[in-house]
Regions:
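Short helix-loop boundary/capping segments
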Residues: 47-95
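Outer-membrane beta-barrel "beta-signal"
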Residues: 140-152
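Membrane-embedded beta-strands of outer-membrane beta-barrel proteins
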Residues: 27-29, 62-66, 104, 146
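Short loop/turn motifs that connect adjacent beta-strands in outer-membrane beta-barrel proteins
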Residues: 1-9, 34-43, 69-77, 110-123
Length: 152
């Protein structure tokens, strides 16, 4: 929510969970920045996080988001990183209190290349999901993905 010109706004978020992930309600300030042409965008949110049905429901979360378009828009590097406190147990019964998750993405924007139709809004790329102690997992996980996306 932003009703003023300053780069700081109010951020309200709901994360709905299924089964082993509890519902969470988040609120806090957000700082957002962008270059004049929006080729570079950055945001950070520092939030209070209430997690339903958790033994310790009062927590925090820090989130960073970014988008960088470069080489005349041919390539995009974007993603987010979250760090939060949440008491939980992994599949082996080990207790964890902090979680880190990031999902950087790299895209090749085909319609920005010579001899490619400008209406072909197709990008090919990859996302790398990396997390530590997320959900019922113990330790660090890396899940690479190949992807295609259409930009409307």
């Amino acid at each position: 929510l932003k009703f003023w010109k300053a780069p700081v706004s109010a951020h309200i978020e709901y994360n709905g969970g299924l089964n082993y992930i509890n519902n969470a309600f988040l609120a806090g300030p957000a700082y957002n920045w962008n270059s004049a042409d929006f080729s570079r965008v950055f945001g950070v949110q520092v939030m209070y996080k209430y997690i339903q049905k958790n033994d310790e429901p009062h927590n925090f979360q820090v989130t960073g988001t970014w988008t960088i378009n470069f080489c005349q828009g041919k390539y995009t590097f974007s993603g987010f990183a979250d760090f939060w406190r949440e008491k939980h147990f992994d599949v082996h019964g080990n207790e964890h209190n902090y979680i880190f998750m990031t999902e950087p993405q790299f895209w090749v924007n085909l319609n920005q290349f010579k001899h490619v139709n400008k209406d072909l809004n197709l990008s090919v790329g990859t996302e790398w999901e990396m997390s530590t102690n997320f959900a019922t997992r113990n330790g660090f996980y890396y899940i690479p993905t190949l992807a295609m996306k259409w930009t409307f």
